[in-house]
Amino acid sequence: MSMHRVARAVASSEACAGALRGSVSRTRFLCLNAPVQRFGARNALLGAGLGAKRHFFQSPIIRSGVAQAVLEKAAADPSALTQEAIVDNLNAAERDRLRRVRNIGIAAHIDSGKTTATERVLFYTGRINAIHEVRGKDAVGAKMDSMELEREKGITIQSAATFCDWMKVENGKEEKYHINLIDTPGHIDFTIEVERALRVLDGAVMILCAVSGVQSQTITVDRQMRRYNVPRISFINKMDRMGANPFKAVEQINQKLRIPAAALQVPIGSEDSFNGVVDLIRMKAIYNDGPKGEIIRETDEIPEELKQLCKEKRALLIETLADVDDEIAEIFLDEKTPSIEQMKAAIRRATINLKFTPVLMGSALADKSVQPMLDAVCDYLPNPAEVENLALDKRRAEAPVKLVSYNELPFVGLAFKLEESNYGQLTYIRVYQGSLRKGMNVFNARTDKRVKIPRIVRMHSNEMEEVPEIGAGEICAVFGVDCASGDTFTDGGLPYSMSSMFVPDPVISLSIKPKTTKDGSNFSKAMNRFQREDPTFRVHVDAESQETIISGMGELHLDIYVERMRREYKVEVETGKPQVAYRETITEHVTFDHTLKKQTGGAGDYARVVGFLEPIEAGPNGYAPSTFKEEVTGGSISDKFLFACEKGFLASCEKGPLLGHPVLGTHMVVNDGATHMTDSSEMAFKNATQQAFRKAFKEGKPQVLEPLMKTTITAPNEFQGNIVGLLNKRNAIISDTEIGPEDFTLIADCSLNAMFGFSSQLRAATQGKGEFGMEFSHYAPAPGQLQKELISNYEKAQADRHKK
């Protein structure tokens, strides 16, 4: 094939990429402009992706200017290089290595059995020799809950990383898959741990309770998976519990999460008699034998009472696949039955393209049907080469560039989690492109500083295994790298950066100080460390009270850090009453014409600003951020002074006039003004704008906004009246109630201010059997009496400070 034909192939590259352009892809990029001589393998990959004959590009070095033009074209248009082309044209060794790698996370609602399932995965893959339960009698605790607090409370607080090898058996042959696994917390207060795990993973296992089905945090996790375009398989756990109803859970996935789903299995027995599953694809019964279910027994003998149900559920699976996969749709319309291979291939395609989630079922605690879930991870979740990852090329105005999971390309990685260890800061890195070697120099794209990698380790919960090198598509941890969570690292030759994770704003704050002054040093160390580790944990010093204020996602979130400070730094602290993150806004249009004029003998201050404030109408997602606009005509205020006006507006919005809280939903327009030849300055216009804002804001019928929390409460049915009574006292708005055979779930919007101390009252009202979770919903006007009290208290506190 001639080079001229390759060049012509570039012109048709749009067609080559058309199939993928309409699909959802994960946004992240590829080094296409490094020296051609150095990366001949890449040229082969690119050329084949653009329609060239594969054997032509097997040569190690291609120096042709036409080939370079092909590379430049692909760099300018990442869609020219499809994921199919990348997968098909990796060299044989790379393709084989990546084909057997899976980077997955386990995520779910609290108490759905994530950590218990992870413990079984580690046991069945040979990573641990014994199973320990989350709340086991031996008091050892699950392997992945390595923190003392996690084992005491029976919850996961930090995401924990590990790796294992799974020997998958297919048609009598064994094949080893390498799985990098992250177990995440289920509690909403630790949602950042789920965010940063999903940001760097290629797939996920979403665990649901067979009794409760889709719960509040399941919906949150689903939203996070969609944010990062993470394919998922679903595992319905706790099939041995009374009231287990897996097909109701499948229906809820379809209806509540709005993603097509179908069961790949039918349970053999139910509740206490749950004994195994029927594989609907191969129509085989699967049982677990051995003391811990470590032996898998398959048989063609399906229980007689299940044969009709299996036939119906298999037909439903094929019908659902026909809705999301063209190949199965054709077979279905021809009234033919797809083969096992066709069904598995369709499930894989639809899952990776985010069109479908296959549903499996089992009981981790009862050691049943966990191994088929591992097989499904290998069969249906993508390998690193099948996921489109993009970076931003700073040289090309942050245009997207594809990253390719190829060891021979220049290194690109993302630091997604920081952790303090006995050996210093531990930085978790996902390697997207190239390889990372011990002793290698890398560059931080944010700081532009060079860093040497002294040690590379693979993590197994709190244990580590040192390795000399880590390949593309893998996850590792490194020591001695000074960085922040979300930093991009490259080999120094690529001006790339990667988008970081979504970080929600804190909703609760409290003042904190060490009980004794001698603990001041350790107190500061703890604050600095916790901030580096957790982007949702914020610390600032109040300018007026000089108190240290910590902010976070909820009471439990802050309680955990206070307790960690005591245990890890031996610092006893005093905390103030929790403070709600209120906001301020106006409700009416109001004009202003304000002049700042000061004469003190020398050069004075002069600035006049004219304009108006108006409310921004609240949308479906609540109040919008405040905005500023200048509409000055005729040059009455110069550009540099208008910039100072905007700075004054932004400063005013940081600390509102009513309570000193940020301002939302307010639009300021400056449309006229005046300057003085000698007395006007940027500072004068900034101050004038702040004064005008404060005065106009108070005339615009201002309101205090309070955060409303979406609160989900689950408890036994007999306590429903007690809980409704508790919520009525708090003026909560109940939006949904779901009554199950044993428990009921209630969802309500509650004022955060009214929820302090709710956990102890809930325990008392339900004899300790109720549980609840909260996540921020939206801001709404606070009750009138509360607004008056808050404003009065703030004004009194301000007056007291001025007296001092």
UniProtKB/Swiss-Prot annotation:
The record's SUPFAM superfamilies line, in alphabetical order, gives: EF-G C-terminal domain-like (SSF54980), P-loop containing nucleoside triphosphate hydrolases (SSF52540), Ribosomal protein S5 domain 2-like (SSF54211), Translation proteins (SSF50447)
UniProt cross-references to InterPro entries, sorted A to Z: EFG_II (IPR041095), EFG_III (IPR009022), EFG_III/V (IPR035647), EFG_IV (IPR047872), EFG_V (IPR035649), EFG_V-like (IPR000640), EFTu-like_2 (IPR004161), G_TR_CS (IPR031157)
What Pfam families does this protein map onto? Answer: EFG_C, EFG_III, EFG_IV, GTP_EFTU, GTP_EFTU_D2
Q: Which UniProt keywords apply?
A: Elongation factor, GTP-binding, Mitochondrion, Nucleotide-binding, Protein biosynthesis, Transit peptide
Q: Which family does it belong to?
A: Belongs to the TRAFAC class translation factor GTPase superfamily. Classic translation factor GTPase family. EF-G/EF-2 subfamily.
Residues annotated for GTP binding in this entry: 108-115, 183-187, 237-240
Molecular function terms, GO-annotated: GTP binding; GTPase activity; translation elongation factor activity
- Summarize the protein's role: Mitochondrial GTPase that catalyzes the GTP-dependent ribosomal translocation step during translation elongation. During this step, the ribosome changes from the pre-translocational (PRE) to the post-translocational (POST) state as the newly formed A-site-bound peptidyl-tRNA and P-site-bound deacylated tRNA move to the P and E sites, respectively. Catalyzes the coordinated movement of the two tRNA molecules, the mRNA and conformational changes in the ribosome.
Q: Which GO terms describe its cellular component?
A: mitochondrion
Q: Where in the cell is it found?
A: Mitochondrion
Q: What is this protein called?
A: Elongation factor G, mitochondrial
Q: Where is the transit peptide?
A: 1-63
Recorded hits in CDD domains, A to Z, give: EF-G (cd01886), EFG_III (cd16262), EFG_mtEFG1_IV (cd01434), mtEFG1_C (cd04097), mtEFG1_II_like (cd04091)
Annotated signal peptide? none
In which pathway does this enzyme or protein participate?
Protein biosynthesis; polypeptide chain elongation
Q: Which GO terms describe its biological process?
A: mitochondrial translational elongation
Q: Tell me which PROSITE patterns the record gives.
A: G_TR_1, G_TR_2
The tr-type G domain covers 99-385
Indicate where this protein is primarily found: mitochondrion
